[in-house]
Amino acid sequence: MKKRLLQVIAFVCVTVTSFLLCSCGEKNDSGNNLDAENIRAEHKVTNSLHKGVENIPDTGKPFIVDGASEYKIVASNYGSHKNAVAKAAGFISSHINSATGVALEVIDGDSDIEWSSSAKLVVVGSEKLQQAAGFRKTADDIGLAGYQIQTVGNSVFVWADGDNGYNLAALALLRVLVGYDCLDLDTYIYTKDGSYLPEMDIVERPDFDYRVDQTLYTVAAPRAYSMGFNQGEPYMTDDPCHTTFYFLPPKVYESENKDWFSNQRCNFVDDQDNYLVHAAQLCYTAHGKPEELKKMQELIADQIMYLTLEKYPDRNLVTVGQQDEDVVCNCDSCMAVVDKYGSIAAAIIPFINGIDDIVQSRLKAYAEEHNQPVKETNILFLSYQSTRFAPKFDDSLKFNDHVGVLICSSKTRYSYTFWDDINVVDKEQTENWQPFGNVYYFYYEINSNNYFVPCNTFRACVENYRFAKINNGRLMTSMGNWKTPYTSSFTAFKSYLNSRLWFNVNYDYVDLEKTFFDNYYGDGGVYMKKFFDEMTSYMDYMRDSGNADFNGVVVNEFTYTAKYWPIKMLQRWNNYCDLALKKIEKTKALNDGTYEALHDRILLETLFPRYIICKYHAAKFSETEIASMRKAFYDDTQYFNLTHESQYETFESLWKGWGLK
């Protein structure tokens, strides 16, 4: 038995009297502990671009001196990225001011600025000043999200080739200058005073070009910018996955174009307009009729052109993904494809490639007509349910350059890693898609059946994100908590982990954990860390004891029962929160909102144990006591605007059952 498990068992044994753990754990009949975390090796990636970020020396040239600076920020005001440049420049100035008390002037445009080696400038964009200074753009492929930061003379040059690149460049420059980090909305830390200008020669590209955090479901634009997530969504449709009936709605086309739709039926009512849909999916061969297939592709291409050029010119991804039904068309043409390749995906790939051929041709013509770069537009389909497994590979099934597969790993046990035996099928699934072309990832780090039971992926996610990067992922999405703005169980910490690890999966988990708990809860962090450590250690123990209910699969039906959550353990964790609240009392005197912010962060974490107590341990209290506890829980969920008990259930039935509605 490995050292880590011995430590966890020691924790359990010491606390067995108060926590009653002996009565709530289930042992593996074989006597074998899965013990995945204890034998888990690190898999650092080597296919990333992070140059010049280690051991950056100072130039010895003063940057902030005695509460003042000679530096100015120049923001280029021409070109397709001028708005992103202006925002980055303003963001840099604002946070240098927050960190040092010094506000650097932002000059809008470079027309009146002349370069000299003695000039003290932070130049964002500006081809003119780059050329004058001899700034050489990197030959590395930085894509649309990468950037370059270089010290030239007394000045600093910041360059990117995309709006998101300028966003990330601003964060990177602030990290070097003032030790910037963002833990949450309006929660910033600075660990440097900006005294001297560093000697920078940085070239970076985030490990995932697209980083969509749904841990908190809706990520406000300022929060996304400050943490380095994509603002809004990079997708061009509201649903990022199941979109085929968005492009070819059965209500419009089904009756007159039966060849476009599957002959497998499901008969469901469309949520949007109450229309009874008969077809389960599209038919990706149009029942063997090429002329009909071409009509389908042209119609979808028309809509993609509108989305990418008019509605969402700042977005680059559009999914043409099958409906959320695990059936496929079984016409003779489709079955011939399945018989040959083993998957209906072999029909979907040429279907999507054909759409892409039309779209890319039109985008190129549009760019030539308007004398501008070709708008990057990537079209995705899903590896999900009937298309979970890759077809047999041959060259005819290679993706076009702007086509990719969005791997939706809904069967994965996310409390383990892809390298653990329990996930071997999902690991092979992902690896088998690699020869085809671009891959994108959609992870289900969520307890979809109950949002108030922790989703214990905090440590395992590090290796799972590395796995995605090693396997050439361009996008990372964590489904998180769908349809609710926040939940308890340290989801704010998970979101912070995502913000840092999706940029560089090689970051050290221990360092990130320390940064978060040392700062996010103020002086109460020491008790919140105790809560977190005990909660995750307990769940690790339950998982590694072979308890399938704690394996991190998206639907964990049985984790929310009284037997798994002894009341004394829950009360202990709530007590930690009470102690944390006492530790922050002194911040009331600041009278600047600090106490209120810290209070709310700690209060939010009480909701998980209180929920379990109120719902599953009610019989241990008098009617008056439990009614009061439930009313207090209700009031706090209203305060935080928490609407959903699970992915598909609001709190309404619970409130009615408790007599609160």
Task: Kindly give the residue locations of the regions a language model identified.
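Bacterial N-terminal signal peptides that target proteins for export
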Residues: M1-V12
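C-terminal motif of bacterial Sec signal peptides marking the signal peptidase cleavage site
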Residues: L20-S23
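Contiguous, structured surface segment used for ligand recognition
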Residues: N38-V203
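Feature activates predominantly on carbohydrate-active enzymes
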Residues: K87-F91, H95, A99, D141-I352, ...
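Structured mid-domain segments that build the active-site/substrate or prosthetic-cofactor binding neighborhood
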Residues: G288-M296, Y306-L307, K311, D421-K530, ...
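Aromatic-lined carbohydrate-recognition surfaces of secreted/lumenal glycan-active proteins
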Residues: I352-A390, Y440-I446, M476-M479
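Substrate-binding cleft/loops of secretory-pathway carbohydrate-active enzymes
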Residues: I379-K411, F452-T457, T487-K494
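Catalytic domains of carbohydrate-active enzymes that cleave complex glycans
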Residues: L501-K661
